[in-house]
Amino acid sequence: MLTLKSSYIKHKTNIYSFLKKAAAITGAVVITACSFSACTPLDGSASRYNNADEQYNAADNESFNAFTDSLFRELASSDSLSLHALLENPSEYGIDDYDITLGRIDIDNIDDTSDITDYITKLNAFDKASLSKSQQITYDLLNKYLYTTLNYSDLYLLNTDLTPTIGIQIQLPLLFSEYTFMEKKDVKEYIQLLSDVDGYFNNLLEFEALRSVRGYTLSDDLLDEVISSCKSIADSAGDAEGMFIGTFNSRVDDLIFLTDDEKNVYKKQNEDAVINHVIPGYNALITTLASFKGTNQYSGGICNYPDGARYFEGLLENCLGWSKSIDEYNDLLDSYIRSYAIVMQKLLRKDPSLNSQFGTFSFGIDKPDQIIEDLKKKITDDYPALSDVNYNINYVSEALNDYASPAMYFMPQIDNLDINSIYINSTGTDSSDLYPTLAHEGYPGHLYQTQYFASTSPSLIRNVIKPGGYIEGWASYVEVHSYEYAGDNTLLNSLVQCNYALILCLYAKGDIGVNYYGWTEAQLSSFLTDYGFNSAEAAHEMYTAFIANPANYCKYVLGFLGFEELKKQAQKDLGDNFSLKEFHRYILETGPVHIDILFDYLKNWENRLVVSSRAA
């Protein structure tokens, strides 16, 4: 049997079945990227800006800068964990007064949208023509983001932060593990935040109670998965060598600005916070979520809930911002599935020996550091240069292995760019999967994109409003193209690449099918069988994953196809003047925006490229 398993693919597929049906199916596309971005100069110099005043050019409208900076300060200070993830020194950005809290949902005013309408009024007061080019892009981004948020604000009860794999109960320990200690204040605030875990979870449970009354609680099997992850964390949180106590102690031991006595005091305070707040918080989740079992009234995809189809549309509009209906997305996926299938068939006709080589395909490297360095060398022809960046590769705690995503990238603080962390889940990622995984998370994926855009000194607000379709679409786009950097057998590389890209498209089809068209598990299984994949267990896992996180797979895959469609348009417009490296530079310098915005500004970039090529 010929098989392929990639970094976000759990199940294997038979290539012969694929040839019979002109398709294949496996896998999953579940990854999270946490935190936000910062800046490095394009020329590789060592300069860094230290406050907001250094970021803007003379062509900017200063009033608009003041508005967006004010919005940034308000959003960034909504909770201290996010604030610290964004800024090491908030006071240098005008943020001096903030509560040390993980944040709260205002249950009593949960449907109040006055803040959004106020932002819209202030934004619309600006004449877009008076803004610089970069400000106009920011204007369009904010306009789309705010109106989309407002238009779907009545559907808040359909959302939950407590889900398998990407739920906050899993992400919170990882966020704490990446909390930087640069001064004594950081250690104190960390312990204060740790002491707020139970209060934070109790607030989330108040919100979940509202969902339960409406019958919106997760299905019992999904609740069991969330509860299981909470139990694993609660059971290990108090371990002397665990992620909350052992990791903290070793980090504190390395802090040269603390005396030995201070280290011992903080270690004791941290342990007390874990015992008295973290573990009780997770136990509260376990007990209360268990009490919600049996209250779900709507089985299947989100479209089966009241206004669920509209909610799914809103999820895609928010993360993609692409002027397409769900039917058009579905048709787009069909066209790419056909295209990839045709290419694969042609490759196998051209070289039938690819059949036997397919199952043994390998990048030839399985050490993370070596893979990153190999990618940095091989991407130079296709992607613009970036100065060297520090990074760390870590492994997810054993307690989270069965629940966390295959890999994650934690973005650096705006004013402390040198801490870039990639986490690998050793359970969810085999060594053979590491190359495309690190292309996704590292070069030329999240790490590279984050640092490159930061080098353009973007407006502060661009660090907190970043459409997921761009972020994850870019990482998926470069992950697919990383197969071009394998061995010298370009035909085999293309075969494996097309197989993986096709798999992603089928996964997005399943997401739409279940969550918008209302496919049952049996219908999903039938769909997979049509493409030569007959595992009932895999179909069940996929169906459950689609229900747990509506539109999550579409965010990755349709974002990826958005860049492919943008590239097709640029190639059509430019002909021989098209440059892949310059096309990537356009995407990277524009930064995280909705796909429509990338298309809107494409012609301006094309005109500049033609002029510069003629001048050369």
Locations of the language-model features?
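N-terminal maturation segment of proteins
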Residues: 42-616
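Short, glycine/alanine-rich hydrophobic alpha-helices that insert into or span membranes
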Residues: 28-32
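N-terminal targeting leaders characterized by basic, low-complexity, disordered sequences
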Residues: 1-5
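Bacterial N-terminal signal peptides that target proteins for export
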Residues: 7-26
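C-terminal motif of bacterial Sec signal peptides marking the signal peptidase cleavage site
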Residues: 33-38
